[in-house]
Amino acid sequence: YLIMAILASLSKVYEQLIQINTKDKLFTYNSIAVDDEDGTVYFLGKYFENNSNKPKKKRAVNFHFELYKVDANGQSNNRFKSSNKYISSLALVKYKNHLACLGLYGKKDLTTSGVCLFNINQKTLQIEIEKYNPFSEQFLTDKFGNKKKLKKRAVKNGLDNITLNNIHVMENGDLIVYAEE
């Protein structure tokens, strides 16, 4: 892949030819983020393991995420995965001097139990903070009303068919997740 960072004045900041050693059928890009200050480009992708593009194999998560950083000095990358949570979607968020991966997670594949957040060190690409926030009682009440059985089932099994649409960054750095059924 050829990465070229260009300023608004159309002058080139840098150009890097990068190679990602993956089989195309086993790797999918999730998102991209660009640092407005220095033109650093971050790529996030999902790499399926065991030569299979099935999300689970033998009841275990069968993929990991790969984060790539490309700048004027070259490229670097880091891999990460959650062994006990199924991350159904994940997107890069670059705001001010922060880099994060934000998404949805579940206890099983194809269900969603809450929102996950990984704060990433921009220099090393290592995860500094990993958080899993289950859906709040207020969210479940808004969705199901006072139907206790449905809320209990949602807490136990997760919600079906939730799709991450967008992430909005507030001025103070708070993140708002837009998702829908």
Walk through the language-model features, giving the residues of each:
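Surface-exposed loop and turn segments in beta-propeller and other repeat-based domains
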Residues: 17-25, 74-84, 124-158
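Blade-loop segments of beta-propeller domains
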Residues: 19-38, 44, 81-87
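Beta-propeller blade signature
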Residues: 2-12, 57-75, 113-126
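Extended, regular secondary-structure scaffolds
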Residues: 33, 37-44, 53-55, 62-73, ...
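Structural signature of eukaryotic scaffold interfaces centered on beta-propeller domains
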Residues: 1, 30-41, 91-99, 105-109, ...
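Short, conserved, GDST-rich strand-edge loop motifs in beta-rich repeat architectures
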Residues: 1-2, 46-61, 104-115, 180-181
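Alpha-solenoid helical-repeat scaffolds
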Residues: 1-2, 8-16, 24-27, 42-44, ...
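Signature of soluble extracytoplasmic/periplasmic domains of secreted precursors
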Residues: 104, 109-134, 163-181
